[in-house]
Amino acid sequence: MLGGNGYVEESGLPRLYRQAPLNSIWEGSGNVIALDVLRAMGRSSDTLAAVTAEIELARGADPRFDDAVKRLHTELGEIEGLPFRARRVAGLLALCLQGSLLLRHAPSAVADVFCATRLGGDWGSVLGTLPAGTDAAKIVERASIRAV
């Protein structure tokens, strides 16, 4: 391994390393981050209340979203063993918040595909598994940078 030199020298390989996601190096493992989310929620009841209030604003907009929110409340209600489920709970919390924001602020085609691929069905943890009939052009259009 190149160690620190792999990030600072000017050959092509270090550039690839620099462009790779470094969150696990900078912020610690995913489990540490998930446990920190639980710690923040435990410090003040206002923290979780604020996030769940934001999530609840989209209730009723999509049945897959509603099911995910129900699962989230179930996970949060089962205090026993919560640290062992920290990654799952933090991930579901993030997905529900993303879903709420997309359902309220994104074009319906974008929100629908998010709910289908992240909140419902059997997508697993693999990105890029879109359902048949997805209007990919609308998603790409939404992500495109436009001159103002």
Where are these regions (language model features)?
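Flavin-dependent oxidoreductase catalytic core characteristic
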Residues: 1-148
